[in-house]
Design a protein with these regions (language model features):
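Membrane-interface "cap" regions at the ends of multi-pass membrane proteins
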Residues: 1-45, 50-54, 61, 68-72, ...
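Helix-loop-helix junctions that connect adjacent transmembrane segments
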Residues: 14-19, 56-57, 134-159, 183-316, ...
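Membrane-interface loop-to-helix entry segments
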Residues: 123, 154-208, 264-268, 385-398, ...
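Loop-to-transmembrane helix boundary motifs in multi-pass membrane proteins
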Residues: 20, 25, 154-160, 254-275, ...
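Membrane-helix boundary/coupling elements in multi-pass transport proteins
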Residues: 42, 106-124, 235, 240-253, ...
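Extracellular loop-to-transmembrane helix junctions
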Residues: 20, 43-148, 227, 267-270, ...
Length: 486
């Protein structure tokens, strides 16, 4: 059986099932912004500022450029093959089944870990919001065991509950999902703009000096962690993860050839502008070294420095909404990739079951929703978040390389959108991805290799034998042999 058997565009489109098509350009843009703006601003800017200083804004730009080049490649694939599955389906088209499975396996971990990691940050802001009203959860129920060495905790109850609520919303239909996301994203954007307008008056340009205290890439005495613009970009790259999930909505999108490219590129553009403005203001208000005091809630720290306590409750609410939309889009993308892999026979049929009433992959959505909820509730996964980055960067590399290959092997295939500047654009995307991967620590590589190995075991032990494409090809070959013998 061929490990690199491929699907054609016609096969991918013909196999798509009638999920309800309701998504338009506005909905896709909101979906992308919902996935991108959240953890990056409200959690990672603290660690990023300590790593790069005020040059964190450049780190965000570097990560955005990488995502922008990769986004153009995703957009071309999405317009060429508007199906669920995102990078998994595109890899099946360009490089064949084994590569597709590896990328799908990789994305499942990426989406689950990001949602679980964000649920931990969500819990922190939720507890702060409760404290503002004089309410307190039992400390044992505020975080997973081992999250805070100074406090005994056992279970992240708020994070567990919010993941279950999001899973329920996702399971009952795309209309409910998009309405919920659209409303939350608009509220989140309004709160971010309010913060910018209020905080900009407290900026002290002297806090931007030196602008890049650690340069491009360096090590500090006594530390194994790299510092500088590139390592910070590798950290905040986590902030941009999610725009690729927009392409997973292809089978629920009206006129996907046009609306998907617009949604992906608009969401990236809006998010990048807001990230750069926010980081410049935050490092202008608070000297970058002082973010060590506010590592878990950097935006709240900026508000504390300004003395605008009235704004704290509003921003905490914005953080909660922002991280809720991130989790929603990640769990949405994960369920659609599992749905596509199940349809291809690489995962059990259970994950491909479509609910008759809601027209959603109901069982698969709940399976991974529960898994993510329990992971975020019981496991300290903060040490694993860089796995999300290396997994996503790997997917970006495959998709970008796929565009190069498809332009060479199928130059005349219909494309509703053509990435400009090919072959330069995908090559630059690949180069930037490798630059960001170089900024990750070695433990991340080891963990990624372990997950990769587990995926190969699943593929050769289960998926290869049950591949729908493989069985179809085998049946066709057997029929030819039988006809020859007759």
């Amino acid at each position: 059986m061929d490990l690199f058997r491929k699907k054609s565009v016609d096969q991918l489109v013909a196999e798509s099932t009638p999920l309800k098509r309701t998504m338009r350009t506005f909905d896709l843009t909101m979906l992308g912004i919902g996935a991108i703006i959240g953890t990056g601003i409200f959690v990672l800017t603290g660690k990023g500022a300590l790593t790069a200083g005020p040059a964190l804004s450049v780190s965000f730009l570097l990560a955005a450029v990488c995502c922008g080049f990769a986004g153009l490649c995703y957009t071309e694939f999405a317009a060429m093959a508007p199906v669920s599955g995102s990078a998994y389906s595109y890899a099946y088209l360009a490089f064949g089944e084994l590569i597709a499975f590896v990328i799908g396996w990789d994305l499942i971990l990426e989406y689950a870990l990001q949602a679980a990691t964000v649920s931990a940050g969500w819990s922190g802001y939720f507890n702060k919001l409760l404290e503002g009203f004089g309410l307190h959860l039992p400390v044992e129920l505020t975080a997973a065991y081992g999250t805070n060495p100074d406090v005994t905790t056992y279970f992240n109850l708020p994070g567990f509950v919010i993941v279950l609520i999001i899973t329920w919303v996702l399971s009952i239909g795309i209309n409910q999902t998009k309405r919920t996301n659209d409303v939350m994203v608009l509220i989140k954007l309004a709160i971010i703009v309010l913060f910018i307008v209020c905080a900009v008056w407290y900026v002290k340009p002297s806090n931007w000096q030196p602008f890049s205290p650690y340069g491009i890439y360096t090590f500090q005495p006594g530390s194994t962690q790299p510092y500088g613009i590139v390592p910070a970009a590798s950290i905040v790259f986590f902030s941009f993860i999610g725009f690729d999930a927009v392409s997973s909505s292809a089978e629920e999108t009206i006129n996907p050839n046009k609306t998907l490219p617009r949604g992906i590129l608009l969401s990236l553009a809006v998010s990048t502008v807001l990230y750069v403005i926010m980081t410049l203001i935050m490092t202008g208000v608070v000297p970058y070294k002082e973010f060590a005091k506010y590592i878990d809630a950097p935006v709240a720290g900026v508000i504390l420095e300004t003395g605008m306590n009235w704004l704290a409750v509003i921003v905490n609410l914005g953080a909660l909404i922002g991280m809720t939309t991130v989790m929603l889009v990640q769990l949405y993308g994960q369920s659609r990739i599992c749905y596509a892999m199940s349809r291809d026979g690489l995962f059990p049929k259970f994950f491909g079951h479509v609910h008759e009433k809601y027209r959603t992959p109901f069982k698969g959505t709940w399976f991974f929703g529960l898994l993510t909820a329990f992971a975020g509730g019981f496991i300290n996964i903060n040490v694993l978040f860089e796995l999300v980055n290396i997994g996503t960067l790997s997917a970006f590399i495959i998709v970008s390389a796929g565009i190069l290959w498809m332009r060479k092997t199928q130059p005349n295939a219909p494309r509703g959108f053509r990435a400009p500047g090919v072959p330069v654009t995908p090559i630059l995307a690949i180069v930037f991805c490798f630059v960001l991967i170089a900024g990750l620590n070695w433990e991340t590589w080891v963990r990624f290799a372990v997950w990769f190995g587990l995926g190969l075991i699943v593929y050769f032990g289960y998926s290869r034998k049950r591949s729908k494409l493989g069985l179809e090809q085998k049946a066709g070959a057997d029929a030819k042999v039988a006809a020859t013998e007759d």
